[in-house]
Regions:
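A short, well-structured beta->alpha microelement
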Residues: 26-44, 139
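Internal alpha/beta core interface subdomains
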Residues: 97-141
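N-terminal loops that bind phosphate or other acidic moieties
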Residues: 3, 7, 77, 87, ...
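Short, structured active-site "lid" loops
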Residues: 41-61
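Short glycine/serine/threonine-rich phosphate/pyrophosphate-binding segments
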Residues: 12-15, 60-64, 99
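General beta-strand structural signal in soluble alpha/beta enzymes
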Residues: 27-32, 53-56, 80-81, 114-118
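Short, acidic/small-residue loops that bind anionic groups at enzyme active sites
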Residues: 69-94, 101-117
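N-terminal basic/disordered segments at the start of proteins
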Residues: 1-28
Length: 141
């Protein structure tokens, strides 16, 4: 999985560096140094199927990704972390895209709390989509 991290503050950049060190090949970009609009950057990440880690507010992440969200089978996984690294939230494509697992991995690396909200996970029940993914089966939306 290719991971792209975007930050908006100095503290966010410091946290992104911790994450980047734990995940080989991760691209880290500061919003103010992008060289293109945030919308164009986000479009590019979705086109390349990169996982997106936003260090900042969930509201910013939602506004960034809204025009590009399509369906659970093709969306890029999106994870949000607050700049203090306290909470790591899979926002989009939790099961099929791997955002839940990525959030847990990131939280483990930075000492944060993964905030997993998918019903099958919080209720510890069987997940058809995770089963299909693990078995290499296809799901049609």
């Amino acid at each position: 999985m290719n991971i792209s991290i975007i930050t908006f503050t100095e503290n966010g950049t410091k946290l992104a560096e911790k994450i980047r060190q734990a995940f080989v090949g991760t691209k880290m970009e500061e919003a103010k140094k992008l060289g293109l609009s945030l919308s164009d950057w986000t479009r590019q990440q979705f086109a390349e199927k990169n996982a997106i880690v936003v260090i900042g507010a969930c509201g910013i992440a939602v506004r960034m990704i809204a025009p590009f969200v399509s369906d659970k089978l093709s969306d890029s996984p999106v994870v949000v972390a607050d700049e203090a690294g306290m909470f790591v939230i899979p926002l989009l494509s939790g099961h099929m895209g791997g955002a839940n697992e990525l959030a847990e991995q990131i939280a483990g690396q930075i000492g944060g709390i993964p905030v997993i909200t998918t019903a099958t996970d919080v209720n510890h029940t069987f997940s058809v989509d995770l089963f299909a993914k693990k078995c290499g089966l296809s799901i049609y939306n």
